Amino acid sequence: GRRLCQHVDRVRLLEHELQAGLPTLDPAGEARVRLPVAVNADSLATWFAPAVAAFAASAPVLLDVAVDDEGHTAEWLRGGAVLAAVTASARPVAGCNHRPLGAMRYLAAASPAFVHQHFADGVDAASLARAPSLVFSPKDELQTRWVRRLCGQHVELPRHTLPSSQAFVVAAAAGMGWGLHPESLIAEHLRQGTLVALLPNLPLDVPLYWQHARATSGLLDGLTH
């Protein structure tokens, strides 16, 4: 079913561009085409919306954005639910174009009071096994990856689940737990001291990629650029 939906979306893109080339097919010039995209929440909360706003304002499209973990957005593309995705997958999906976007830098951070309460003796496997952490969803492995990099072993983390990038920041600043946050999203909190980095010299950089269906479409190309 999803494959069929993706095929229909591609056909609609091509039909729209045919109409654009032959105005008599759409004399009102009001037809808009649906463009389904999958994006990870942190990209949506930081750079994605500003990056596509100008395109969405000038092109006859209606963006339909689905949110999922960056490690799973490629599945939306592979399954045919979307025509493009921001993903952490370095492997191109079959039938798709693939280009690197750069890396999103994450810092482990918490409120000063939380750090004093849970990490007064340092950030190590023992303290991390006791201190509540924040995760976006059961799919979110960023905290686990950062801990494994720090400790060289798996640590079972107590966790609160908060499926919102903004709620992550608010909860951390309120002392609910520690978590991995996009550096750009918490920069002001770090400057004001409402959040502190657990280990400032141990960021986690997550490479991101843009993948989109290999359809001959000026709209997809416009969104990509």
Tell me the role of every PLM-derived stretch:
Residues 30-94:
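Central regulatory/effector-binding core of bacterial HTH transcription factors
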Residues 83-87, 177-181, 198:
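Paired acidic/hydrophobic, glycine-rich loop segments that form the ligand-binding mouth/hinge
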Residues 26-35, 127-130:
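Immediate post-signal peptide segment of exported/extracytoplasmic ligand-binding proteins
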Residues 97-176, 185-205:
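C-terminal regulatory
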Residues 1-27:
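Alpha-helical "hinge/linker" immediately C-terminal to small N-terminal DNA-binding modules
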Residues 34-39, 85, 109, 134, ...:
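Short, well-ordered beta-strand segments
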Residues 69-70, 87-92, 110-112, 164, ...:
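Beta->alpha turn/N-cap motifs
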Residues 47, 200-225:
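A late-sequence structural motif
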